[in-house]
């Protein structure tokens, strides 16, 4: 049983970049994750993001990552106990993809905030100063992230990252559902923008730049600032 629990926790830690965040444990001792609740209604981000997109994105897309990730955890739990190393290696792809999808979307929901509650208000305080220092201005950061997101081939994410060792902020991109930690162990996500088509196609069709330009109106910079200050505290 101890080996099973350890294997599951190690797999979860891999996807989360070294910090396991269990939500529940089954009777077998397998650590699983759960779909997080949103702090706002599906339609609260309109007209920037439609309620239909938010409902499908959360209830279907993210929920599927959770189901498939938990399934992969159960499977790797079994093959580790059996000592089947080749099966463990084969499951890493499913764990990375679905675990990354869960991690990335859990951050994404926190990065969004209704306009009526302060969404879109530019960053202030220490994060605002860091952005000015590392990018020249807030407007320059937005332009850079929009350009990186528009240029990203296929599906993926564009991130505002904090390098906790260098104490610098940077723009990073990751393919598919790769979490930011795959670009460097010292990188902490402050903001992530989902540029998979499921995040915008029903509303913006194939015009990804329009989606990128508009999403800043519902960005939760208060959350990003809190993460920044907590990491560097």
UniProtKB/Swiss-Prot annotation:
Cofactor(s) listed: Mn(2+)
UniProt superkingdom: Eukaryota
Keywords carried by this UniProt record: Manganese, Metal-binding, Mitochondrion, Oxidoreductase, Transit peptide
GO cellular component terms attached to this protein's record: mitochondrial matrix; mitochondrion
UniProt record, GO biological process: response to abscisic acid; response to osmotic stress
Known EC number: 1.15.1.1
InterPro entries: Fe/Mn_Superoxide_Dismutase, Mn/Fe_SOD, Mn/Fe_SOD_BS, Mn/Fe_SOD_C, Mn/Fe_SOD_N, Mn/Fe_SOD_N_sf, SOD_C_sf
Catalysis performed (reactions): 2 superoxide + 2 H(+) = H2O2 + O2
PROSITE patterns reported for this sequence: SOD_MN
Co-factor binding details: Binds 1 Mn(2+) ion per subunit.
Binding site for Mn(2+): 57, 105, 194, 198
Subcellular location: Mitochondrion matrix
GO MF annotations in UniProt: manganese ion binding; superoxide dismutase activity
Keyword Iron-sulfur tagged: no
Organelle transit peptide residues: 1-29
Tissue and organ expression note: Predominantly expressed in the embryo late in embryogenesis.
Protein family (similarity comment): Belongs to the iron/manganese superoxide dismutase family.
Function: Destroys superoxide anion radicals which are normally produced within the cells and which are toxic to biological systems.
PANTHER family: SUPEROXIDE DISMUTASE 2, SUPEROXIDE DISMUTASE [MN], MITOCHONDRIAL
Complex formation: Homotetramer.
Protein name in UniProt: Superoxide dismutase [Mn] 3.3, mitochondrial
